[in-house]
A protein has these predicted regions:
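N-terminal nicking endonuclease/strand-transfer module with a His-rich metal-binding environment
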Residues: 1-173
Length: 173
């Protein structure tokens, strides 16, 4: 019986949690293969930088750290080696779009065909990290918005208010 393939895309507000979920044999009973084009450090840095950027922008809603595609494969793919199918598919996606990926190959509940969970970053990995050094002290209020002076983040007791941050001159940020 011919079935239709489908593709579903989701926005991921917690990329590390989702990676852990789709690649865990303990949580996924029909997991056949997993593959990564970047290590855990990349995904941790991506999540941290995305959250920082989101706070700085002051935008409402949830921060989107990455995206996930769920792709149902035609039944013919069950005849091939699962790890090979997953690696070929993931590497082709990486080559075509130039993004880092994590993928997992699962069976559907009826075990008639495979589907791939493909998590990818919208940001590209820089060849060298972009290290910034503050040329002067920078102050941020509780909402993450930059303020001009230290006076604007000092409470009545003369201390920096909780939630406010200071990046001192010469610090890496």
């Amino acid at each position: 019986m011919a079935r239709h393939s489908f593709i579903q895309m989701s926005k991921l507000p917690n990329v590390k949690g989702r990676i852990s979920y789709i690649t865990s044999h303990a949580r996924q009973e029909n997991l056949y293969a997993t593959y990564r084009t970047a290590d855990n450090e990349f995904w941790s840095n991506l999540a941290r930088e995305s959250q920082q950027e989101f706070k700085r922008s002051g935008t409402e809603g949830k921060c989107i750290e990455a995206r996930e595609l769920i792709i149902a494969l035609p039944e013919v793919y069950t005849r091939y080696e699962p790890q090979e199918v997953l690696e070929d598919f993931t590497e082709e996606f990486r080559r075509r779009y130039g993004v880092e990926c994590v993928s997992a190959l699962h069976h559907n509940k009826r075990k008639t065909n495979y589907h791939i969970h493909l998590i990818f970053s919208e940001r590209k990995l820089l060849p060298e990290p972009d290290i910034k050094i503050a040329t002067r002290s920078v102050f941020y209020d509780e909402t993450g918005k930059r303020v001009r002076t230290k006076k604007e983040i000092i409470g009545e007791d003369g201390q920096i208010r909780k939630g406010c941050t200071v990046i001192k001159k010469g610090e890496v940020y």
